[in-house]
């Protein structure tokens, strides 16, 4: 299948990872391509940083997170024959050795605020708490005493505080986490809680 890759002078990914301060991204749940489902992500300067373009007739169990120029950064795939909702994330477009796995929390006994657990090689890395339907989530680092490493918040106008709705929201990523990983987790949450 042919892919469309717009030409941009430079990618914003390097500047995002070099930052020591929190990175604020605006996530728009809309593809830039006609007849596609996906995401468009901008930095604080309004520059395109990430994009996801899924054609309407393609299955949603294989998603590719790309940079602004269309280079594949991470592949997100639903785990087949899994008891729960489980997603595996790979580097680029590879299908070997997942970087991490995200599993939806289905236990009614455990913490009700917990949405999902993220692990790598049987070690829990992150816990995601909050409500994706309300666009109010925190990604907590389990290795650093549940320190907040990223947050999803509703985006509001500067004047008047009017919310944009559920399709436009902020992703605030602390320096301890890669922005591409935080965006991959946001995409997984959208798949897990699509009807919310």
From Swiss-Prot:
InterPro entries given in the database record: LOR, LOR_sf, Tubby-like_C
Superkingdom classification of source: Eukaryota
One Pfam family hit: LOR
Role of this protein: Might be related to the phospholipid scramblase and tubby-like superfamily of membrane tethered transcription factors.
Name listed for the protein in its UniProt record: Protein LURP-one-related 8
Annotated family: Belongs to the LOR family.
